[in-house]
């Protein structure tokens, strides 16, 4: 048959073959929701799935574009492959707008390859602003033989997200501490 052409705008055409994994956070959330419903767990669970289509079109984002988040914060796009953090930020804003009462909010994401570089493929990173919840999650992971490693929300790295054009950067400016700046975003 006729050979199809592929358009690849990533560093390596092989990396595109792994992009299905970018839906991992949503898959985890749906799996948890299904498990809780299956056992009739008496919890009030709200599931919010911010989703994106990454197809290329004339409306696609470009590096250095400034877009506005749901709460009208101007965001300068540092890398178009970092769309997940924009989605998560908008989902958190949605939670605030909806005045959803909750004991805590969990989000799951394949946010950066930087966490994988730091911790490898078998040890997920955990970020939290709640020390007690973080300890509980880490301890439960150890019990279930599914460990995680807590990384810091190191506030001084917030300055890497600042831009001179009154926008914040979606990716940070230094290229270091990338997993942390993604979580801070």
Segments (PLM) and residue ranges:
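A generic structural signal for tightly packed, nonpolar segments enriched in small/aliphatic residues
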Residues: 3-6, 10-185
């Amino acid at each position: 048959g006729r050979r199809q052409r592929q358009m690849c705008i990533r560093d390596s055409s092989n990396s595109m073959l792994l992009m299905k994994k970018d839906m991992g956070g949503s898959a985890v959330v749906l799996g948890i929701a299904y498990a809780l419903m299956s056992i009739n767990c008496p919890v009030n669970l709200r599931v919010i799935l911010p989703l994106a289509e990454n197809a290329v079109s004339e409306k696609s984002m470009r590096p250095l574009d400034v877009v506005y988040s749901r709460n009208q914060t101007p965001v300068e796009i540092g890398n178009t492959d970092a769309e997940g953090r924009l989605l998560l930020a908008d989902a958190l804003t949605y939670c605030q707008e909806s005045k959803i009462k909750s004991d805590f909010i969990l989000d799951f994401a394949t946010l950066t390859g930087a966490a994988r570089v730091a911790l490898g493929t078998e040890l997920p990173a955990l970020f939290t602003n709640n020390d007690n919840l973080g300890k509980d999650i880490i301890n439960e992971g150890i019990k279930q033989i599914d460990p995680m490693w807590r990384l810091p929300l190191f506030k001084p790295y917030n300055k890497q997200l600042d831009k001179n054009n009154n926008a914040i950067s979606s990716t940070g400016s230094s290229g270091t501490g990338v997993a942390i700046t993604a979580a801070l975003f």
